[in-house]
Design a protein with these regions (language model features):
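Beta-loop-alpha module in the N-terminal Rossmann-like domain of NAD(P)-dependent dehydrogenases
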Residues: 9, 49-110
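Rossmann-fold dehydrogenase core element
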Residues: 106-123, 143-148
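C-terminal helical cap and adjacent loop that interface with cofactors, partners, or active-site loops
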Residues: 44, 280-420
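Predominantly a Rossmann-like dinucleotide-binding segment in NAD(P)-dependent oxidoreductases
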Residues: 124-271, 402
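N-terminal Rossmann-like dinucleotide-binding module
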Residues: 1-46
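Short, conserved SAM-binding/catalytic segment
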Residues: 39-48, 106-114
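Short, Asp-centered acidic motifs that coordinate Mg2+ and/or phosphate
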Residues: 28, 66-67, 147
């Protein structure tokens, strides 16, 4: 099977490498960054004539493969996904589908009309950890699920890197925080609740990473700052110790100390975190009600030490406590009194070696199985994934307007806009 790769950044290269390892050909690449384009061409043996600057250029060619991996920036997905589907490509599409509801719905409509498969990279559904959690929730061990408490702990260093200095710092250039970081989590909540979402309320803001919170005497860039040796957000302290690994690997292809220092001196990751042009939230709390009566709270926060997810699922007969970082799922059956301990079971799922706890390789395997006829429908088929995107968009609308948003009404409103 032949793939074309549109977007040879970190995510696109991961998916393409898994496809290649399973014996499939990466036949063409589109990537505006010349160095990344060259790296992809060398890694996959792509001839110069099949290397393109943009997805538009690649998609103007005669069909070059069976499927396209689209892993460009959020706001580029629509202009690449629709022509790719019309051209006859199946899609492995990085999330989010699009930050614009009408574009998300248009991609879904095009996929259904053309009969092409679209798998959205909600990779967490494929990790052993979340598969075990789903099995525990759906298996009746705590009875019927009543309510869910879900925390996405972004990690303080991670929010500074990706959502203050980085590519996803502005909702107008990429997506709101809840879409970019947490359409994953909206998808998990639908999956764990076993139902579509009825309504959502949401609250949050950009509270801390603002100029008024900058330390006295600090500078606009770390290279000029007298506090660069002591500030926890100093780019020198954030990136030099992890040269060659994420997140330093995002700054530049040259991971030598000299290369990183130059990137810090001249690039966006060397800016003071209090003086960037970021506008996405640094924390957001959402309250959700599902069609089957399950309720959930979702806390998305950059003010955490660890970068992990913690979940509590509360049922009629017990509760499930899960920590992604600890790789532990604890199931507790309620006792008759507070003096006795309830029946307790601890599950430690298989530890996968690939990214996102095995989800990165899992979604590629799932996509390949679907294209090869070994699987009927992907767990993250476009029709499944649109639900989580409507939830994330509705949550952002609820946050901005201070209202409770009904998901069905929200979707109908944007369907009318998309069809207009």
């Amino acid at each position: 099977m032949k793939f074309v790769l549109i977007g040879a950044g970190q995510r696109g290269m991961i998916y393409a490498k898994y496809a290649r390892e399973r014996g499939h050909e990466i036949a063409a690449v589109a990537e505006p960054d010349g160095i990344r384009r060259q790296i992809a061409a060398e890694a996959f043996g792509i001839p110069e004539g099949a290397c393109f600057h943009t997805g538009k250029e690649l998609l103007e060619q005669p069909k070059l493969g069976d499927a396209a991996i689209i892993a460009t920036m959020d706001r580029d997905h629509f202009q690449e996904a629709v022509p790719a589907l019309e051209k006859g490509y199946h899609l492995l599409l990085e999330k989010p589908i699009s930050p614009v509801p009408e574009e998300t719905l248009a991609i879904e409509e095009t996929a259904l009309r053309t009969g092409r498969h679209v798998s959205v990279c909600h990779v967490l559904r494929y990790s052993p950890f979340f598969r075990e959690l789903k099995k525990a929730a759906a298996g009746g061990k705590v009875g019927r699920v009543i309510t869910i408490q879900h925390n996405e702990n972004i990690g303080n260093f991670h929010i500074a890197h990706s959502f203050v200095r980085g590519n996803w710092r502005r909702s107008d250039l990429a997506s709101p925080l809840i879409m970019q970081k947490s359409c994953h989590d909206m998808d998990l909540l639908v999956w764990l609740a076993g139902s579509g979402c009825e309504s959502v309320a949401s609250f949050g803001d950009l509270t801390y990473f603002r100029e008024e919170n900058a330390p006295a005497g600090s500078a606009r860039r770390c290279c000029d700052c007298p506090l660069k040796d002591s500030c926890r957000f100093s780019a020198y302290r954030c990136y030099l110790p992890v040269a060659g690994d994420w997140p330093a690997a995002v700054l530049t292809e040259d991971q030598s100390e000299e290369g990183l220092r130059e990137a810090i001196r001249t690039g966006p990751y060397g800016r003071c975190v209090y003086r960037c042009d970021n506008n996405v939230c640094d924390h957001q709390v959402s309250i959700l009600r599902f069609d089957n009566g399950v309720t959930a709270t979702f806390n998305l926060s950059g003010f955490t030490d660890r970068m992990t997810r913690t979940i509590k699922i509360m049922g009629e007969d017990g509760e499930i406590r899960a920590s992604e970082a600890e790789n532990e799922i604890e199931i507790i059956r309620f006792a008759s009194t507070g003096r006795e301990a309830g029946e307790r079971e601890v599950i430690r799922p298989e530890v996968a070696q690939s990214g996102h706890s095995g989800g990165d390789s899992g979604i590629v395997e799932d996509f390949l199985a679907m294209l090869e006829g070994r699987l009927g429908t992907s767990a993250t088929d476009i029709r499944e994934s649109v639900e989580s995107h409507m939830m994330a968009c509705a949550a952002e609308e609820a946050r901005l307007t201070g209202t409770v948003v009904r998901i069905a009404d929200f979707r109908r409103r944007h369907e009318r806009k998309q069809q207009a």
